[in-house]
A protein has these predicted regions:
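Macromolecular interaction modules
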Residues: 1-99
Length: 99
């Protein structure tokens, strides 16, 4: 399996982020072609930490090619273009093969 991970910084308006993300962005992301599953969470630090992400999203695909095709699809482009609507500070995106 192959994972696309998105890490979001703490927004200025947390309530707007959470509402928009749950009601608008996640339903879009769930339409990515080839998506096997996706999950998101609002993590908490264990002990003192200043660099804990506000939100983490993971999307699972069968392969790197499936992920690439999803991200280059019309829906993938729509999902990417939606990010500034709830996360004006952007996001960090990375991917990996699960072992």
């Amino acid at each position: 399996m192959y994972c696309l991970t998105v890490i979001y910084p703490r927004p200025d308006d947390e309530a707007h982020f959470k509402k928009y993300y749950k009601e608008t962005h996640i339903p879009l992301a769930k339409q990515l072609p080839g998506l096997k599953s996706c999950h998101y969470a609002y993590p908490a630090a264990i002990g003192p930490a200043d660099n804990v992400p506000f939100c983490i999203f993971q999307a699972w695909f069968e392969s790197p090619d499936a992920m690439g095709q999803a991200m280059q699809s019309d829906m993938g482009k729509k999902v990417g273009a939606d990010v500034p609507n709830y996360s004006p500070k952007g996001a960090t995106i990375f991917h990996f093969a699960a072992e």
